[in-house]
Design a protein with these regions (language model features):
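N-terminal leader/linker segments that precede catalytic domains of diphosphate-processing enzymes
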Residues: 1-114, 119-136, 140-173, 215-256
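NUDIX/MutT-family hydrolases
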Residues: 177-216
Length: 256
């Protein structure tokens, strides 16, 4: 007889880390080249760009995370959070993306998970804005040639259209987070996105759209960041270039 607890543990166990290699880079470039990106009209929305910043990392280099959420803070998540504490530890290894915990002192979305990024300035392209924000937020300055491509725009409840830009930073990059904007920065192995239990979906009474959740470390990453990471997995890692995430809902706590 199968042990349900064993099956659940197996489904949450990520595959082995992926090598940060030219082979992976070229595979991502090829998949993005076959992806027909969907851009959304602004129609009064503010335009922002984020970087899915791909770096290398060592297994075990993130053995602890001092920023633990309280049970009250975790209670706003529309899901069973048993065993979760909001920490991002034990997720590094191989090809990774950079995930930020926003500063607690910010006026909006304080302490929430985010990718490096921000508003697109007048005259900037999404790629230029993503590179600028990467420099400003995590101290990584990269040339335009580091950009591999873009994924679909995502419209947020707070009035933004977000353009995700996939960026290859190189194997020796040093992260230097700006404390005014970023409380902590993490290298999360992209293999964590390939877990059998990821992504997962829940329903909420406030919307008929499914709320997407990406299990990472001791937390669940929600849209918009979660939606962008899901499309990155499907398109760039799995090669499922026609998959879309525009209909994935955000949790109510992220609507403001």
């Amino acid at each position: 007889m199968k042990d349900p607890a064993h099956d659940a543990a197996a489904s949450s166990r990520p595959p082995s880390p992926l090598d940060y290699s030219d082979t992976l880079r070229q595979s991502i470039v090829d998949h993005l080249g076959r992806h027909e990106r969907r851009a959304l009209p602004l129609e009064g929305h503010r335009h922002a760009a984020v970087a899915i910043l791909l770096v290398d990392s060592e297994v075990g280099s993130d053995g602890d995370d001092a920023f633990k959420f309280t049970a009250e803070q975790m209670s706003i998540i529309p899901s069973d959070v048993t065993g979760l504490d909001g920490r991002m530890a034990g997720v590094a290894g191989g090809a990774s993306f950079v995930l930020c915990r926003r500063s607690a002192g910010l006026n909006s979305h304080a302490s929430q998970w985010a990718l490096p990024g921000g508003r697109i300035d007048a005259g900037e392209t999404a790629a230029e804005a993503a590179l600028r924000e990467t420099d400003e937020e995590v101290g990584v300055r990269l040339p335009a040639s580091a950009v591999l491509g873009e994924l679909d725009d995502y419209q947020t409840r707070s009035g933004y259209i977000i353009t995700p830009v996939v960026v290859w930073a190189g194997p020796t990059v040093e992260l230097r987070p700006n404390p005014d904007e970023v409380l902590a920065v993490y290298r999360v192995g992209v293999h964590e996105l390939l877990r059998e239990d990821s992504p997962r979906f829940v329903t909420i009474p406030e919307s008929d759209r499914p709320v997407v959740q990406v299990p990472l470390g001791g937390d669940l990453i929600h849209a918009p960041t979660g939606a962008l990471l899901v499309q990155f997995r499907w398109v760039c890692l799995d090669g499922r270039v026609d998959e879309r995430v525009a209909d994935f809902e955000q949790p109510v706590f992220a609507w403001g």
